[in-house]
């Protein structure tokens, strides 16, 4: 079994990270995917991947709540990283309107640019969608039947929305 989404590299796990990983192994988790949040999380995530090779695998992306006024700088880092090394996925990407709607246009731009890169690099995506189902589906519409693949995370929609 693969854990497709863990931010176990976050500071709040500093005191018991090794024990958490041991428990994950004991219950049959064979791999853990580490989705990136932004430029600040990247070093910690890469350190964890290096500490647990063949068990923890890093994904690169910019979380929608990290999209703000200077989002282009964050996206440039993602692009640079995609050119620098291999990644297991592009994520965590998407649209989140739970906390703030101020940067919705920028979230859509960032989401679609990262979707383009997923197709370019033939990588799956880790899509975060919270309180933004319609906006997310509209942003995904141009990518139907293009070979995009991946998982949804933080999905707050209902059954009918999931079927869509």
Describe each region flagged by the PLM.
Residues 1-164:
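Mid-domain alpha/beta scaffold segments of enzyme catalytic cores
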